[in-house]
């Protein structure tokens, strides 16, 4: 495949086995004005929509793909690689998205991790008897974070939670 101004397309997702690709190929992508690719074509995000956000756009596309896939054969297994850019720098998030999680992480990531584990067990996402894995030893325990640094860490968790992962992962 010939090289283009945006690189050799033989290394793009569609040539690595993905039937459909929508997203960005470069790092540190703007969530407001991204450079997008759909399969092998460059596509433009809407320029006149002040509510546009790449993470919403990617989630909409992922869910539409899932609906189409399930309509074709609901029993057929699938693999969707959903990797929104919003959870990586630069963190472009609408304040209202993050603010709705204000205070939800004030007890820290260890407590949150335990809650998620218990919720996954209750929902049947993980089988009964599954043990919570030990915290990564390179990750500090919440108790070891100095009090004056905790508000910053709490805000980072609020920002991260403000993205669309819940809408994508809770789709039935």
Label for each model-derived stretch:
Residues 168-172:
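Conserved small/polar residues in nucleotide/adenosyl-binding loops
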Residues 105-135:
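Alpha-helical "lid/cap" subdomains adjacent to substrate-binding clefts that gate access
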């Amino acid at each position: 495949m010939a090289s283009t101004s945006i690189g050799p397309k033989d290394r793009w997702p569609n040539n690595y086995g993905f039937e459909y690709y929508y997203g960005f190929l470069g790092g540190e992508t703007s969530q407001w004005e991204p450079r997008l690719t759909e399969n092998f074509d460059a596509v433009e995000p809407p320029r006149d929509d002040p509510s546009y956000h790449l993470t919403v756009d990617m989630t909409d596309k992922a869910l539409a793909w899932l609906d189409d896939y399930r309509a074709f054969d609901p029993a057929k297994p699938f693999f969707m690689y959903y990797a929104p850019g919003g959870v990586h720098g630069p963190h472009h998030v609408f304040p209202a998205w993050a603010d709705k999680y204000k205070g939800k992480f004030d007890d820290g990531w260890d407590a949150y991790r335990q809650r998620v584990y218990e919720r996954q067990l209750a929902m049947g996402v993980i089988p009964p008897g599954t043990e919570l894995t030990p915290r990564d030893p390179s990750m500090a325990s919440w108790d070891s974070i100095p009090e004056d640094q905790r508000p910053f860490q709490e805000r980072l968790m609020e920002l991260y939670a403000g993205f669309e992962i819940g809408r994508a992962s809770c789709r039935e």
